[in-house]
């Protein structure tokens, strides 16, 4: 069966499930590798080298003039993250973003945040996944080492 481009991301946006054995999942694997490479490049630069932002802009597909993210930073699906104006994410953030993450205006995040938007299917836990979006509301301040893990069906 042939699947349209972006099909796997539609499934993720709708909560899944997705199946890693299906051909459509290759697009997700490609995005994960793209994101890992861009994060690794950004994280390899010295903290006082402002050019690390170029990799993060490519990761998220937008200019980050109004957003500040400190490295080290890890995100597996840059195409599933949106950030409004004035967002600040301190170092050591890990975003497992396949289900989607939205940072509304003015969100401030302390070091060490962890956000998970994916879960394993309870019956086929090695091959199928379900998803749920996380939205951090306008002007929220998130403390150090906070974990967000969606409770998924």
Label the model's feature ranges.
Residues 1-66:
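Terminal amphipathic alpha-helical/low-complexity segments used for targeting or macromolecular assembly
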Residues 2-3, 7-20, 111-112, 116-138, ...:
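Glycine-rich hexapeptide-repeat left-handed beta-helix
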Residues 22-24, 79, 99, 126:
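Solvent-exposed, flexible loop/coil residues
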Residues 47-51, 102, 153:
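Alpha-helix N-cap and coil->helix boundary residues
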Residues 48-50, 68-72, 90-94, 122-125:
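Short gly/ser/thr-rich secondary-structure transition/capping motifs
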Residues 60-62, 108, 127:
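Generic structural signal for beta-strand residues in well-ordered domains
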Residues 70-71, 76-79, 84-85, 89-91, ...:
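Left-handed beta-helix
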């Amino acid at each position: 069966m042939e699947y349209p481009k972006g099909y796997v991301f539609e499934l993720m946006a709708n909560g899944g499930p997705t199946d890693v054995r299906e051909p459509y999942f290759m697009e997700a694997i490609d995005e994960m590798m793209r994101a890992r490479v861009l994060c690794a490049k950004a994280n390899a630069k010295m903290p006082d080298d402002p050019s690390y932002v170029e990799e993060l802009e490519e990761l998220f597909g937008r200019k980050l003039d109004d957003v500040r993210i400190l490295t080290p930073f890890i995100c597996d699906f840059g195409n599933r993250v949106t950030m409004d104006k004035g967002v600040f994410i301190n170092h050591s953030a890990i975003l497992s973003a396949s289900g989607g993450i939205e940072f509304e205006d003015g969100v401030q995040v302390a070091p060490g945040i962890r956000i998970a938007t994916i879960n394993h299917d309870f019956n086929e836990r090695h091959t199928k996944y379900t998803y749920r979006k996380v939205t951090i509301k306008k002007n929220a301040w998130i403390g150090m080492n906070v974990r967000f893990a969606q409770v998924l069906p």
